[in-house]
Amino acid sequence: MTELRQRVAREPEAPPEDKESESEAKADGETASDSESRVEAVTQPPSADDTPEVLNRALSNLSSRWKNWWVRGILTLAMIAFFFIIIYLGPMVLMMIVMCVQIKCFHEIITIGYNVYHSYDLPWFRTLSWYFLLCVNYFFYGETVTDYFFTLVQREEPLRILSKYHRFISFTLYLTGFCMFVLSLVKKHYRLQFYMFGWTHVTLLIVVTQSHLVIHNLFEGMIWFIVPISCVICNDIMAYMFGFFFGRTPLIKLSPKKTWEGFIGGFFATVVFGLLLSYVMSGYRCFVCPVEYNNDTNSFTVDCEPSGLFRLQEYNIPGVIQSIIGWKTVRMYPFQIHSIALSTFASLIGPFGGFFASGFKRAFKIKDFANTIPGHGGIMDRFDCQYLMATFVNVYIASFIRGPNPSKLVQQFLTLRPDQQLHIFNTLKSHLTDKGMLTAATEDK
């Protein structure tokens, strides 16, 4: 007995469970607190010039200010030309480009997180990030395919099954990724892994959701896609030009190069541009008609009878303005009035998407999201305002433009059982008869 007591006294006292968890939390906390210093050490980009050699030689005699002006200008014209080309190629190509832009933006944001924390060797971080991107895209675009390609989906048996159980399949895919994340948790990196889990989901919310709304805007008519994007591009260009030549007063600390002169000049230029572009595009059916799938030709069609938004109307000019310009009325498309709201948002609120991105880049001490486009940075640097604009346009259409869609009602009607269809038919017939829109003679026939 004495020997046993001596042995117990010699053995070190086992640490209580609370102390163990406390030490774990402390170690984990130290790991998280080190992340800020890691940002400086890891993500500081090398000061390399990504300008093409041809432009470097041609602009070698210019100052850095004017060299940047010409580089940005030339690349901007190239991007505008590319934008015209993809518009000419039609809605299907536009949707593919939107998907490519979405994937590239996601890659740029996730890469920043990976560069900061890759030294910790977090298991499955990149794999799970891309897996969740696949899951979310399957969920969103599966719904879109069902909505806009209903007859095609119902015609093909595999697509019909996928459509019927779409949400369950989407949930199962996400749940699989969730379980994989839980299984990947490592004792010394708990907090950091949850940081990156949140990082991935916020990125998905910003990038995938917004690009999904862009696709929906496109299906409402190409004009709802082209005008908002063009307004953001115009505001970006004109704000830069006004700021370059007249900028004196700083606008916001997050972006020291942004000035009030550029902000105000960009606003007025964008409103005028939006009115002119809307006037030109409203006269073409290929721009104003909703994008629909034709089952007979298995292709997209943009042919319809334009709605009242795209028919010229005469408006009375306020008396104050009449005395200045001498006109009493003006003929314009109702859509031009809506374009003022779009261009105003693109000029006054849209830049805050850029300020948000600037704050993000400052937090990680990087200049650009990537160096994909010389003089401009990454793809995300060009689309930081576009995503905010896409959300506004979608909400604007749903609130002020879109009404009941007869074609979708017919699609839903055709999915019902025959007895349900007959019940709706009799109810509708009685309703139309009571309204006097369906006479007894017509009913007998």
Swiss-Prot record:
Pfam families: CTP_transf_1. The modification Phosphothreonine is found at residues 31, 51. It is a multi-pass membrane protein. InterPro entries: PC_trans, PC_Trfase_euk. Residues 1-39 have a biased composition (Basic and acidic residues). The chain crosses the membrane at residues 79-99, 132-152, 166-186, 213-233, 262-282, 340-360. Keywords: Endoplasmic reticulum, Lipid biosynthesis, Lipid metabolism, Membrane, Nucleotidyltransferase, Phospholipid biosynthesis, Phospholipid metabolism, Phosphoprotein, Transferase, Transmembrane, Transmembrane helix. Its EC number is 2.7.7.41. It catalyses: a 1,2-diacyl-sn-glycero-3-phosphate + CTP + H(+) = a CDP-1,2-diacyl-sn-glycerol + diphosphate; 1-octadecanoyl-2-(5Z,8Z,11Z,14Z-eicosatetraenoyl)-sn-glycero-3-phosphate + CTP + H(+) = 1-octadecanoyl-2-(5Z,8Z,11Z,14Z-eicosatetraenoyl)-sn-glycero-3-cytidine-5'-diphosphate + diphosphate; 1-octadecanoyl-2-(9Z,12Z-octadecadienoyl)-sn-glycero-3-phosphate + CTP + H(+) = 1-octadecanoyl-2-(9Z,12Z-octadecadienoyl)-sn-glycero-3-cytidine-5'-diphosphate + diphosphate; 1-hexadecanoyl-2-(5Z,8Z,11Z,14Z-eicosatetraenoyl)-sn-glycero-3-phosphate + CTP + H(+) = 1-hexadecanoyl-2-(5Z,8Z,11Z,14Z-eicosatetraenoyl)-sn-glycero-3-cytidine-5'-diphosphate + diphosphate. It is found in: Endoplasmic reticulum membrane. GO terms for molecular function: phosphatidate cytidylyltransferase activity. One of its GO terms (biological process) is lipid droplet formation. It comes from the Eukaryota. Pathway: Phospholipid metabolism; CDP-diacylglycerol biosynthesis; CDP-diacylglycerol from sn-glycerol 3-phosphate: step 3/3. One of its GO terms (cellular component) is endoplasmic reticulum membrane. Residues 1-52 are annotated as: Disordered. The modification Phosphoserine is found at residues 21, 33, 35, 37. It is an enzyme of class 2 (transferase). Catalyzes the conversion of phosphatidic acid (PA) to CDP-diacylglycerol (CDP-DAG), an essential intermediate in the synthesis of phosphatidylglycerol, cardiolipin and phosphatidylinositol. Exhibits specificity for the nature of the acyl chains at the sn-1 and sn-2 positions in the substrate, PA and the preferred acyl chain composition is 1-stearoyl-2-arachidonoyl-sn-phosphatidic acid. Plays an important role in regulating the growth and maturation of lipid droplets which are storage organelles at the center of lipid and energy homeostasis. Belongs to the CDS family. Homodimer. This is Phosphatidate cytidylyltransferase 2. The gene is CDS2.
